[in-house]
Design a protein with these regions (language model features):
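Juxtamembrane helix-entry segments on the extracytoplasmic side of multipass membrane proteins
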Residues: 1-13, 65-79
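Residue-level hotspots within the lipid-embedded alpha helices of multi-pass solute transporters
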Residues: 16-21, 53, 77-82
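Membrane-interface helix/loop boundary segments of multi-pass membrane proteins
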Residues: 22-49, 64, 93-98
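Functionally important transmembrane alpha-helices
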Residues: 46, 70-130
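Membrane-interface helix-cap regions at the ends of transmembrane helices
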Residues: 53-66
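Hydrophobic core of alpha-helical transmembrane segments in multi-pass integral membrane proteins
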Residues: 126-144
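Membrane-interface capping segments at transmembrane-helix boundaries
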Residues: 138-156
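Short, intrinsically disordered terminal tails adjacent to the first/last structured region
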Residues: 151-168
Length: 168
């Protein structure tokens, strides 16, 4: 990102749209729907994390903050990527499959955490908030899945809509 000031103010919107939105066309627009055909949202997020984190490995060789931290950042990096993948899967599913929504979220995250003025504190706080958000997203979803299993076959759905085989 250190090259952005040299490109001028007009480069920022282009970077903003391509940095997050460009990636999300592949990760959430292409891969996620295919993974979710056979896996839960959480498992799909975990599988997507492997590819997504691998895609970002080159940053360890050119981003100054990554270079100074060395290999000790890798476990936290993968945990953060999993949290991010979980949040983006949730957002993608909640938005009806909007790649634009996840792309803008991703680009905003990149802007806050990767800008030269962000510093380590902004990146750390933002990443921590994403991890907390991931836990908040996953916990109720897993609990709802257990509750819905208790009601299976009764005709009562958590959505409030009638289910096949019974009425609300």
């Amino acid at each position: 990102m250190n090259f952005l000031p040299d490109l001028g103010l007009l480069a920022w919107p282009l970077w903003f749209l391509t940095s997050g939105c460009g990636e999300e066309l592949g990760w959430r627009g292409f891969a996620l729907p295919r993974l979710q055909r056979t896996h839960s949202a959480l498992v799909s997020s975990a599988l997507l994390t492997i590819g997504w984190a691998s895609w970002h490995v080159p940053m360890f060789f050119y981003v100054p903050s990554y270079l100074t931290l060395g290999l000790r950042i890798v476990p936290g990096f993968f945990l953060g990527m999993f949290a991010g993948a979980t949040v983006l899967t949730w957002l993608y599913n909640r938005s009806g499959g909007s790649v634009l929504a996840v792309g803008l979220w991703h680009a905003s995250f990149n802007f806050v955490t990767a800008s030269p003025n962000a510093g380590g504190l902004a990146a750390a706080v933002t990443s921590t908030l994403v991890m907390v958000w991931a836990v908040i997203v996953v916990w109720p979803t897993r609990r709802a899945r257990r509750i819905s299993a208790d009601y299976r076959g009764t005709g009562v759905a958590l959505t409030g809509a009638p289910t096949q085989g019974g009425s609300r």
